[in-house]
């Protein structure tokens, strides 16, 4: 996977971390997410909180290979991992008691990728 065209060092590091975890654990999930982040930025997912609230259940682990935006409200207690969060999304997630973090943090906690849902 070629990440030499990425300008952001943080993004390059995130992709490399996910690829390494995928190799070590044998999980194709983290490899797929790393490939999605290595693609063009126009192809990144942009997911609103209302969509997460609509499709997720309490206790779910949701991964968004892109951006989480703060449109809508969230009433379920979920863990959300994404490349970036908007300010309003972070505020609404923390106010509702949800956990949010980088994708690599979720991958380190759950290297096999069990019970993780990708949302686009």
From Swiss-Prot:
The keyword Ribosomal protein applies. It comes from the Archaea. Keywords: Ribonucleoprotein, Ribosomal protein. PROSITE patterns: RIBOSOMAL_L18E (PS01106). The keyword Ribosomal protein applies. InterPro entries: Ribosomal_eL18, Ribosomal_eL18/eL18-A/B/_CS, Ribosomal_eL18_arc, Ribosomal_uL15/eL18, Ribosomal_uL15/eL18_sf. One of its GO terms (molecular function) is RNA binding. GO terms for biological process: translation. GO terms for cellular component: cytosolic large ribosomal subunit. Belongs to the eukaryotic ribosomal protein eL18 family. This is Large ribosomal subunit protein eL18.
